[in-house]
């Protein structure tokens, strides 16, 4: 919603806000200096304000400071995202995130969960992106459960490549647990893409980046 800050808001007899002078039309928005909206949600954030969320030595104070800075941009909810790495490294990343989240009320309010982006991705050049392909693996439920345990049960979104072995079997299990599943860093054919959607995939992580330039619609 865009509103004109040069005009006073309307209040009732008790002094409570009744309405704001709203500007209409996209053309007016281009000149807007103030925007009212619900808080924004960032589903994939690897770090902010110089703080790396994939640092196994992440300090709670640094984590909280980065969230305060993020809050000032209008983002009120985010999913700190752990990228592909060795299983031990990913576990350490989640332990550090959990320590930071549990240490601050702001983190608990802003972070409903985490995003696991890898290691069940396509290791081929062009699709793996900046992720280290040597750590990409076929998908197994046991592997995911170990990471979920390290994350305190708070992995709420996972990005996978549906053409990778084990992923199509993993998707419905994740969905059953209430975990949102996205495709990304992938190169599925038409049939595999449809099967992934039927299995429960509902999102695409940074669509157009780390995937084939043309995907079947």
Model region roles, listed by residue range:
Residues 90-105, 169-180:
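Short, electropositive alpha-helical surface patch
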Residues 122-149:
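Conserved phosphate-binding/catalytic loop of the ribokinase/pfkB sugar-kinase fold
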Residues 141, 145, 149-217:
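Active-site core of metal-dependent hydrolases
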Residues 47-61, 129-137, 182-184:
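Active-site mouth loops of central-metabolism enzymes
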Residues 46-52, 64-93, 109-122, 151-163, ...:
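Divalent metal-dependent hydrolysis catalytic cores, especially in the metallo-beta-lactamase
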Residues 36-51, 118-128, 163-172:
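N-terminal small/glycine-rich loop or linker at the start of catalytic domains
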Residues 63, 90, 94, 140, ...:
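Aromatic/hydrophobic pocket-lining residues that form the small-molecule binding cavity
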């Amino acid at each position: 919603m865009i509103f004109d800050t040069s005009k006073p808001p309307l209040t009732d007899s008790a002094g409570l806000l009744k309405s704001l002078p709203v500007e209409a039309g996209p053309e007016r928005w281009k000149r807007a200096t103030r925007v009212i909206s619900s808080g924004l949600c960032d589903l994939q954030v690897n770090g902010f304000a110089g703080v790396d969320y994939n640092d196994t030595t992440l300090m709670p104070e640094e984590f909280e400071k980065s969230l305060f800075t993020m809050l000032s941009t209008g983002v009120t909810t985010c999913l700190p995202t752990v990228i592909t790495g060795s299983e031990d490294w990913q576990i350490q990343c989640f332990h550090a995130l959990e320590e930071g989240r549990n240490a601050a009320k702001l983190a608990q309010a802003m972070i409903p969960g985490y995003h696991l982006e890898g290691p069940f991705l396509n290791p081929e050049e062009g699709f793996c992106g900046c992720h280290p392909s040597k750590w990409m693996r076929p998908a197994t439920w046991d592997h995911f459960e170990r990471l979920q345990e390290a994350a305190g049960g708070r992995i709420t979104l996972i990005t996978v490549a549906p053409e990778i072995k084990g992923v199509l079997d993993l998707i419905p299990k994740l969905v059953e647990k209430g975990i949102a599943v996205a495709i990304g860093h992938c190169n599925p054919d038409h049939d595999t893409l449809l099967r992934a959607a039927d299995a429960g995939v509902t999102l695409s992580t940074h669509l157009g980046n780390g995937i084939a330039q043309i995907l079947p619609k």
